[in-house]
């Protein structure tokens, strides 16, 4: 399954937990795994606190401190920092499914991380059922 994600800012975190949870519920799978993958070199996916929006701001602030917009980058397309940030955050997450629901902590959410927007992006979701061997 592919989720379309339309980003509006150059750098932003978008909570996609609800959309992914709906896909898991529609799958009818009781127990298994949900893999979320970003097929872009300037975007990523992460799991972090979703209750307090200031956490998203803090994450972006720290990433901008670690990887500044302007530096002596050799890649001349103007988005080198986006490539580095996406590498640090990572392109995928694997979440357990139990009783038909994603296993996330009380405050956890799944975030699409845009580092070179705005753009139309894709988020691949694979839902795999667990089979027990006897």
State the predicted function of each range.
Residues 1-134:
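Active-site histidine-anchored catalytic micro-motif
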């Amino acid at each position: 399954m592919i989720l379309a994600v339309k980003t509006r800012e150059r750098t932003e975190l978008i909570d996609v937990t609800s959309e992914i949870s709906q896909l898991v519920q529609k799958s009818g799978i009781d127990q298994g795994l949900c893999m979320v993958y970003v097929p872009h070199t300037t975007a990523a996916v992460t799991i972090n606190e979703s209750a307090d929006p200031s956490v998203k701001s803090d994450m972006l602030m720290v990433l901008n401190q670690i990887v500044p917009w302007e530096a002596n980058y050799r890649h001349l397309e103007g988005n080198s920092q986006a490539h580095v940030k996406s590498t640090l955050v990572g392109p995928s997450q694997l979440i357990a499914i139990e009783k038909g629901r994603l296993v996330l902590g009380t405050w956890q959410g799944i975030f699409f991380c845009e580092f070179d927007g705005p753009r139309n992006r894709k988020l691949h979701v694979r839902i795999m059922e667990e089979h027990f061997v006897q």
